[in-house]
């Protein structure tokens, strides 16, 4: 059996949670006073816990509690000041697309009951990487410059395929792109140039561009490849107006860094 293609998500799903939040940098006090004059004494009283609890620290990232994220495990440990960053093309699901999912998911769950629908849909143009907080705005500006020349285009995603993340801790059912591949390669080429400028990991050598539909914890390839994949493909092929439904207009590139989103409209 061939190995399932890899997807560019972190194990905790960079698209559905911030891996880290920015760390504030304390500034040294001025400590200035006139020559020969002692500074005024000061006394700092402790802040009551009841008050501190009203204002969670922005320097602390989310706890690495996999139970809070559907059993997902972080690919990289949280460090203060590090932001998980992901570049992608968003896909806004309409009612007809949800109707298709309502048929696909129950069939897939017959083979892998732990499967759940993705909370949002997108097509990745990068792996999930870690940015230092002070890199975010320069990174986004360079990315915007690289994306400025790209025009909107249609692509079709209609081939059912099974994916895993690099650590084999999550499995995905996706719809692979069957048209528009060349345009995505051009975009990834520019995204990779940005990554190299910031000494970050580039995208996969031979990417399989796709929109993930559902996922589960663990390596479920044995359950999902073969008969299940074939049955899901038949559902897609026979679904009413699937040819038009799965033809998507790429209108913008989006960068998610921690809990911040940056949109770059295509021309």
From Swiss-Prot:
Annotated catalysed reactions: a 3'-end uridylyl-uridine-RNA = a 3'-end 2',3'-cyclophospho-uridine-RNA + uridine; a 3'-end uridylyl-adenosine-RNA = a 3'-end 2',3'-cyclophospho-uridine-RNA + adenosine
Locations listed in the record: Nucleus
Active site per database record: 122 (proton acceptor), 210 (proton donor)
Keyword terms of this UniProt record: Hydrolase, Lyase, Nuclease, Nucleus
Region (Disordered): 1-72
Record GO terms (molecular function): 3'-5'-RNA exonuclease activity; lyase activity; poly(U)-specific exoribonuclease activity, producing 3' uridine cyclic phosphate ends
Binding site for AMP: 122-124, 204, 206-212
Sequence positions that bind UMP: 166, 204, 208-212
One Gene Ontology cellular component: nucleoplasm
GO-annotated biological processes: RNA splicing; snRNA 3'-end processing; U6 snRNA 3'-end processing
Top enzyme category: lyase
Major location category of this protein: nucleus
EC number: 4.6.1.-
Function per UniProt: 3'-5' RNA exonuclease that trims the 3' end of oligo(U) and oligo(A) tracts of the pre-U6 small nuclear RNA (snRNA) molecule, leading to the formation of a mature U6 snRNA 3' end-terminated with a 2',3'-cyclic phosphate. Participates in the U6 snRNA 3' end processing that prevents U6 snRNA degradation. In addition also removes uridines from the 3' end of U6atac snRNA and possibly the vault RNA VTRNA1-1.
Subunit structure: Interacts with PLRG1, CDC5L and PRPF19.
UniProt record similarity statement: Belongs to the 2H phosphoesterase superfamily. USB1 family.
The protein's name in its UniProt record: U6 snRNA phosphodiesterase 1
Organism: Rattus norvegicus (Rat)
């Amino acid at each position: 059996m061939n190995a399932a293609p890899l997807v560019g998500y972190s194990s905790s799903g960079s698209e559905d949670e911030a891996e880290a939040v920015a760390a504030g940098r304390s500034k040294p006090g001025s400590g200035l006073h006139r020559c020969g004059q002692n500074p005024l004494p000061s006394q700092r009283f402790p802040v009551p816990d009841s008050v501190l609890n009203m204002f969670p620290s922005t320097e602390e990232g989310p706890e690495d509690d996999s139970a809070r994220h559907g059993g997902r495990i972080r690919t990289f440990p949280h460090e203060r000041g590090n932001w998980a960053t992901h570049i992608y093309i968003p896909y806004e699901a309409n009612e007809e697309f949800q109707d298709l999912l309502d048929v696909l998911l129950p069939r897939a769950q017959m083979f892998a009951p732990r499967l759940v629908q993705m909370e949002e849909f997108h097509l990745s143009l990068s792996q999930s990487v870690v940015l230092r907080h002070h890199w975010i705005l320069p990174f986004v500006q360079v990315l915007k410059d690289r994306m400025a020349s790209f025009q909107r285009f249609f692509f079709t995603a209609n081939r059912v395929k099974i994916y895993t993340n690099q650590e084999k801790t999550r499995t995905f059912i996706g719809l692979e792109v069957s048209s528009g591949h060349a345009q995505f390669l051009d975009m990834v080429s520019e995204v990779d140039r940005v990554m190299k400028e910031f000494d970050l990991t580039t995208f996969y050598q031979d990417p399989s561009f796709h929109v993930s539909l559902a996922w589960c914890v663990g390596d479920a390839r044995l359950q999902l490849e073969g008969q299940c994949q074939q049955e899901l493909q038949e559902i897609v092929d026979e679904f009413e107006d699937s040819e038009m439904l799965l033809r998507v207009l790429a209108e913008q590139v989006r960068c998610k860094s921690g809990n911040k989103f940056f949109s770059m409209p295509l021309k």
